[in-house]
Amino acid sequence: MGAAPCASKVRLRVRADQVESVTLRIWWNNAEYRWFMRRVEGGFYEYEMSIPEQPGLLWYYFIAKDKEGNTWYLGNANDGMGGEGVVTRSEPPAFQVTVYDPAYRTPEWMRDGLMMQIMVDRFNNAGGTDMKNLPRGSYYHAHWDDDPALVINDKRGSNSANDFFGGNLKGIEEKLDYIRSMGVTVLYFNPIFEANSNHKYNTGDYMKIDPSFGTEQDFKELCAAAKKKGIRIILDGVFSHTGSDSVYFDRYGNYGGKGAYCDPQSPYRSWYNFNDWPDNYESWWGFNTLPNVNEEDPSYKKFIITGRNSVLAHWMRAGAGGWRLDVADELPMDFLRALRKREKGIDPDSALIGEVWEDPTKKMAYGELRCYCTGDTVDAVMNYPLREAVLDFMRCRINARDFVRRVESMRENQPKQFFYSQMNLLGSHDRPRALAVLADVGNMEPERKYRYPIELDKKDYDHGKRRLIAAWNLICALPGMPCIYYGDEAGLYAMSDPYCRGTYPWGREDQELLEAFRACDKRRMKSHALRTGDMRLTAVGEDVVLVERSIRGGKDVFGKAAANEHRAVAVNRSGESRWIEYGGKIVEIAGESALILK
């Protein structure tokens, strides 16, 4: 049954010939209910169920008794992915119903948009570099095309992350025409606030742009220039922890000694949990450079969310069009709800995207089953499950039927407005470059100390490139907001962090790959059907996935007026040609490619 709005009515029907009775077993809010189903014509049993009035997850399956007194169950498949039920003699997994707020809305521009993720330091430099803007102990690379440095600096295997290349906000503004030429309408930046690392996930001051990136005025000017070109800017909000080298913690005394580590009377003392002040404190995954914050602390909540000039409000007034929330599944649900309420109060058309790596409809975090698509937290998440499905399919780890099943499970369990707003990515700063993965030359995510700059020969590069183009066509044919990780479109390939965070190869781009991305992006942006049309997903044999998108009756899936249209894309993951029947004809799809069908 999938997702349903609160307080709606749903009629459940099950065909069960030659049984005496069928019972519907339901779980809601830690309570169990059983209802006898009514027998109707055709051997069916049915029950009209009232969906609860509050958002959450509802679970159910059917219990049948035959004339001999035997008990049979009809429930979810063992993989829990929904679809057609399975009959068993033992208790099965339950079907899921995602109960969501009927007032749930996501911005239209998300489902219509195309995103690019950019690490500011690695994209483009404008105006040169100045050593005085670098954090203490950091350095600039001598050459833009150097590999990022890997210096393991502790027993946990973390990277020192103190090497910089000089990318800045003015550098991004300088390249807005290029960005727009790729069809991009949304830019997501990794953190840009002051911090002593190149990745900036250890915030030093939430109210300041990092000096190596520019100034607040530079940010405002970038937002204004981007807006003129139809591009919105999303910021990275790191709110589960701060840096130890920060205004708020100040372990090293670099910020005046008023932080929680230095001063027991610090105004920030209640933000942190000390087991034995000052050296023994809770930190993110045990990294003492990332002290955890208590998100429910009133003063912290006021500083980040509710205050008149909170972090959230300040940067949205400066031009940000929304936020991507770092480790969203580690933030308390009430914190997320408060954040959503304030953000939408400032700008109802802003976006809130969560970093959730697993199924966002039922993520188990800290002993709590959480659902992020009921309308009270985020608009969408980074769609890592789709990334895994696409890459697994293209590398022959799963077949076409498996791929279709994974995507249909997402569609079934997610509200439509969430499903069509998902951030659909192939690469990110936390994963190896997609081309490297698709080249299939070995493990691209070994333990950090075993990572190194790889060199692909022409054969392996071309193999990964063919697969990448096909994979990107598949991403752009599916509902959701496609996201380019900067440089993927230009031919960058690398192992995971830090090498996946290399610089954009200006002047060394793979022009053929660029044009393939650009053509795909433009095709999507010109087609209502590819953005908000209905979807039919078909597995054709083991190797071909056929995606059909259509608008009928003059309206898209959200009821918005749109011209009738039908688009189809077939992707063949095999290394050899495959033939499919389409439109009454037999058509050939070359190996490891996508075919645009008319």
Which positions does each model-derived feature cover?
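Carbohydrate-binding surface patches
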Residues: 11, 537-583
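Glycan-association/targeting regions that enable binding to alpha-glucans and other polysaccharides
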Residues: 1-112, 116-117
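Hydrophobic faces of well-ordered beta-strands that scaffold small-molecule active sites
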Residues: 114-116, 187-189, 233-235, 323, ...
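C-terminal beta-strand-rich structural cap/linker in extracellular carbohydrate-active enzymes
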Residues: 16, 587-598
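Substrate-binding/active-site clefts of carbohydrate-active enzymes
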Residues: 120-186, 192-318, 339-346, 362
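Conserved, mostly hydrophobic/aromatic
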Residues: 118, 179, 189, 206, ...
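Active-site-proximal helices and loops of the catalytic beta/alpha 8
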Residues: 223-232, 240-241, 246-257, 311, ...
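Aromatic/acidic polysaccharide-binding cleft in carbohydrate-active enzymes
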Residues: 121, 366-367, 423-456, 472-510
